[in-house]
């Protein structure tokens, strides 16, 4: 099933399993890659559902405030983001006890333990 969205935001576009591969957000709160305007900052200056990736307008994989960007590794998608200088890098651990995948080693050492799925982070 093709994910043909209208120009405006369409949260029901990816409601079917056939279209899930075109989704950039969780089911029920998703945006379609076929509708870039719905996940990127609009030309008029209005804010859209974008990640905190240095203002690049990368599409979110999760709801605003708890999103990872498309350019992040797939294993890190659909998780909260760490406070790594506002880079929007995906967390490998729960909020408050997390290390970012692209953070310096010293920043990862600040956490005592976490369930990092094979990333080797602290």
From Swiss-Prot:
Segments for region (Spacer B2): 73-81
Protein role: Copper metallothionein that protects the cell against copper toxicity by tightly chelating copper ions. Required for antioxidant-mediated growth rescue in the presence of fluconazole. Acts as a critical factors for lung colonization and virulence.
Localization of this protein: Cytoplasm, Cell cortex
Stretches for region Cys-rich copper-binding 3: 82-103
Sequence segments annotated as region (Cys-rich copper-binding 1): 1-35
Disrupted-gene phenotype: Fungi lacking both CMT1 and CMT2 show attenuated virulence and reduced pulmonary colonization in mice. Impairs growth rescue by antioxidants when cells are treated with fluconazole.
Region (Cys-rich copper-binding 2): 51-72
Gene Ontology MF annotations: metal ion binding
Free-text comment on this protein's domains from its UniProt entry: Divided into 4 Cys-rich domains by 3 spacer sequences termed B1-B3. Each cystein-rich domain contains the conserved copper-binding motif Cys-X-Cys-X6-Cys-X-Cys-X4-Cys-X-Cys-X2-Cys. The copper-binding domains together are able to chelate up to 16 copper ions.
UniProt-annotated stretches for the region Spacer B3: 104-113
Spans annotated as Cys-rich copper-binding 4: 114-122
Keyword Signal: no
Induction behaviour: Expression is induced in a dose-dependent manner in response to high concentrations of copper and basal transcription is repressed in the presence of the copper chelator bathocuproin sulphonate (BCS). Expression is regulated by the CUF1 copper-dependent transcription factor. Highly induced during mice pulmonary infection.
Protein name: Copper metallothionein 1
Annotated family: Belongs to the metallothionein superfamily.
Stretch list, region Spacer B1: 36-50
Keywords: Copper, Cytoplasm, Metal-binding, Metal-thiolate cluster, Repeat
Name of the gene: CMT1
A cellular component annotation (GO) from this entry: cell cortex
């Amino acid at each position: 099933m093709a994910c043909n969205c209208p120009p405006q935001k369409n949260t029901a576009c990816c409601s079917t399993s056939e279209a899930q591969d075109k989704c950039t957000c969780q089911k029920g709160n998703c945006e379609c890659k076929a509708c870039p305007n719905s996940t990127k900052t609009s030309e008029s200056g209005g804010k859209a559902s974008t990640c905190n990736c240095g203002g690049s307008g990368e599409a979110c994989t999760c709801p605003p405030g708890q999103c990872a960007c498309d350019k992040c590794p797939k294993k890190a998608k659909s998780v909260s983001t760490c406070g790594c200088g506002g880079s929007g890098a995906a967390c490998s651990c729960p909020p408050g006890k997390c290390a970012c995948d692209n953070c310096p080693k010293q920043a990862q050492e600040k956490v005592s333990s976490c369930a990092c799925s094979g990333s080797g982070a602290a």
